[in-house]
């Protein structure tokens, strides 16, 4: 493996279709990771919300082929995204053989299966905000897969095909969980306004989708 020596790699983060009907609810995980990457100086980072836009598979591949990302991040937040992720990774590998494919989300719990049965190269095993930034920083200088062993929160197959799972990074603080650059969606014309009653019960329900809110250190 030899990565391209870019000062700023081109990165595209994509979602996967979650349900039969598209949803305009903001994809918090993807947005949070993109925010952190941009803050770290990786300004050539872009978002393709497949779950909302619902392009055909052919349109998705055509878009990625045109954009030529150096790193493709797949946000797979549900286990049912496996079939789509597998199909997407193989198709991308065929048309963009030099693109590094990085996966995050709950599907990463099945890291060994994904790494051995798909064309995904690396998996974020926990929170992606720190891992994604550290991963891209290491990508800039790595010569082999083994060079990624110091990136926390990462899973991959080394040069000998052995599964490597690195330690988790320190969790982000409660203040950072929703520290998101909402202009990412606004610039794409994909932002929606969510209004709720001004009481704690409603607010807890509205933002109750992220299990990290239950962590003791974030209460």
Task: Name each region found by the language model.
Residues 14-17, 48, 75, 104, ...:
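Short hydrophobic segments within beta-strands
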Residues 36, 44-174:
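Glycine-rich beta-alpha loop elements in corrinoid/cobalamin-binding modules
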Residues 180-219:
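Radical SAM [4Fe-4S] cluster-binding motif and immediate context
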Residues 9-21, 72:
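Nucleotide-activated donor-dependent transferases that construct or modify glycoconjugates
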Residues 33:
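N-terminal cofactor/phosphate-binding cores enriched in small/glycine residues
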Residues 1-6:
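Short boundary motifs at domain starts and secondary-structure transition points
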Residues 19-30:
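Glycine- and acidic-residue-enriched helix-capping/strand-helix junction motifs
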């Amino acid at each position: 493996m030899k990565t391209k020596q870019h000062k700023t790699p081109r990165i595209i983060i994509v979602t996967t279709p979650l349900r039969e009907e598209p949803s305009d609810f903001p994809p918090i995980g993807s947005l949070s990771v993109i925010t952190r990457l941009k803050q770290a100086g990786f300004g050539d980072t872009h978002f393709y919300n497949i779950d909302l836009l619902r392009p055909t598979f052919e349109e998705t591949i055509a878009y990625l082929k045109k954009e030529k990302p150096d790193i493709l991040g797949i946000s797979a937040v549900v286990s049912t995204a496996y079939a789509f992720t597998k199909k997407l990774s193989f198709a991308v590998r065929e048309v963009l053989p030099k693109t590094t494919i990085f996966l995050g989300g709950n599907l990463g719990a099945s890291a060994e299966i994904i790494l051995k049965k798909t064309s995904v190269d690396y998996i974020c095993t926990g929170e992606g905000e720190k891992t994604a930034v550290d991963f891209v920083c290491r990508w800039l200088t790595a010569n082999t897969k083994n060079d990624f062993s110091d990136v926390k929160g990462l899973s991959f197959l080394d040069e000998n095909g052995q599964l490597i799972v690195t330690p988790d990074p320190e969790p982000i603080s409660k203040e950072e969980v929703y520290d998101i650059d909402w202009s990412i969606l606004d610039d794409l014309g994909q932002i929606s306004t969510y209004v709720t009653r001004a009481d704690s019960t409603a607010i807890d329900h509205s933002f109750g989708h992220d299990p990290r809110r239950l962590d003791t250190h974030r209460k």
